[in-house]
Structures are given as structure tokens and as C-alpha cells.
Design a protein with these regions (language model features):
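A generic short-segment signal for beta-strand/edge and adjacent turn/coil regions
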Residues: 22-27, 50-53, 84-90
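A short pocket-lining beta-strand/turn micro-motif at the edge of beta-sheets
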Residues: 34, 50-52, 77-80
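A short SAM/SAH-binding and catalytic strip from SAM-dependent methyltransferases
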Residues: 44, 49-66
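C-terminal substrate-binding/active-site "lid" region of AdoMet-derived donor-dependent transferases
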Residues: 61-134
């Protein structure tokens, strides 16, 4: 994952290391978390974000940041994206490849209530399986 604040990337890496200690090694593969890593960087500067799943705590992102990130995401090959932003916000800043499929409430570590919107990348919807509106 990409974190814009170096200290948060460090905290995330330590949390990941802690997860390894909690895994039941006899029941789960050692490779379970092998694809998880964190780095401190500016995601808006990437050409694309080619992760399978994206989670963004984007409540604090400015319109300018969202627009820059939308350009990167529009070129990206993710399957699932989780964001605190409503679909219309993403569509308005140019991210048209996302289709909302669910939303859920959660609490942050600071006990603040939030809504997460779950999107899929329309590039990976099989042809002919789009939902049709009855006429």
C-alpha cells in the first residue's frame, strides 16, 4: 500500500508484522500476507496503481487530490476499491470505471463513525453481465 505520511507507513508495516504472530501457522499458508507491503509515497505521482484491492481513507483528501488520484485510478487495474467517497464524487472528478456494489458503516480507531463505499472496476465485469434496467 501507499501512504503519504512516512510514519503511517511505518506503523502499518509494524501492524503487518504483528499479524504474522497471530496466524495459526498449521492452518494457514505462510504466503497469506506475502503480497502486502507499505511504502511512503505520493499515489498521485504514479502512472497507475496495479494492486488487486485498494482501500483509501480519503475523507481528508481535497478536491484537487481526488482529481489527481482519479487520473491514476482510471489507468489502474484494480478489482476492488474501498473509499469513503460517494460514487458521484468519484464520477465528478473523472473516475468512470468504478461501479458501486455495497456500502458499510465502520468506526475508526478514534471511534468516529464512517461509511465505506465498495466499488468494482467495470473493466473486469464480464461482457453481457451488466445489470439491465427493465423496460
Amino acid at each position: 500500500g501507499i501512504e503519504c505520511v512516512a510514519k503511517r507507513a511505518e506503523i502499518s508495516t509494524h501492524a503487518l508484522q504483528g499479524l504474522y504472530g497471530e496466524l495459526d501457522r498449521e492452518r494457514l499458508s505462510d504466503d497469506l500476507l506475502r503480497g502486502v507491503a507499505f511504502e511512503a509515497a505520493d499515489a498521485t505521482q504514479y502512472s497507475s496503481l496495479d494492486y488487486s484491492h485498494l482501500y483509501m481513507f480519503d475523507r481528508v483528501f481535497s478536491h484537487c487530490t481526488l482529481a489527481a488520484l482519479a487520473k491514476v485510478l482510471q489507468r489502474s487495474s484494480f478489482y476492488v476499491m474501498i473509499s469513503s467517497r460517494k460514487p458521484q464524487v468519484w464520477w465528478d472528478v473523472g473516475l468512470h470505471k468504478v461501479q458501486p456494489v455495497a456500502k458499510m458503516r465502520f468506526k475508526t480507531t478514534g471511534r468516529e463513525g464512517c461509511t465505506a463505499f465498495i466499488y468494482i472496476n467495470k473493466d473486469f465485469i464480464p461482457p453481457g453481465s451488466e445489470q439491465r434496467v427493465p423496460e
